[in-house]
């Protein structure tokens, strides 16, 4: 079986991406009200995020975006979080448009339903940046910023398959706990993972698309499969750290042994701590600072009537895809700590101090 050689990205990757961040060339439209001037009313930028169950949005995406956009000019951010409710997000978008936002940065709850938000914005000549998740069924987007989401699934799948092989597990069986079926990114994670798993000797015992990315629903699913597949679960493909946490809770409650190999994504602090403790094998680290600041830079350019460059065409939409990185116990120091995403003190709380020392995380 072909093994994946992980190329560990450190802060240099983020710096490179930031350094090559879009340079603008003048568009045909006159610039909007000067957003670099401190005089006059602030230019409003809408930021619509999808949910709060994943900690990244409130802890990282929002504050990083707001700090960057305000450093670029006289901007006010009109912010809303939809709490995984597509109808609520539609209302929030209409409210932001009524409030006079000049650019809308949208991370959709439902990729298909969000096309109507884009249509409403277009009718008012407000450009939309599709952030992290691609709005489906429309080419009326000014820009799309995300990570290579199919590659995320490939990295997760390779990590799981390779670890099972390295551990000498014969005829391994796994559960697949995918993300929300209404999240376009989750579809790509699943596709990428299957492209690896389906070619391996790993058997998928059962598979579940987790509504709303709910850790509780992931836990319930895994708990049910433990009873059905007693002694057969060698691994769990969990699409993110939230669903991984649900899987871990179910497995611990059932005292499953030997412990399965469990994947994840988002490099949440709880996910990193589970990796340190040996409860989770890996996660996917995304340089959210780079992504959020890039979105702010593009929003600034669009607000000024400029045309962002340095993009590739994806389904008719100017796109910038960033690079995801595998994190295991062995490279925590070289990734999330070195990049300043977390400090050792944040990871190595009292509960995890001994595990951190054993893993040389200090």
Role assignments for model-derived ranges:
Residues 18-22:
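Bacterial Sec-type N-terminal signal peptides, specifically the leucine/valine-rich hydrophobic h-region
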Residues 5-17:
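Sec-dependent signal peptide hydrophobic core
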Residues 2-7, 24-362:
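A residue-level marker of the well-folded mature domains of exported/periplasmic proteins
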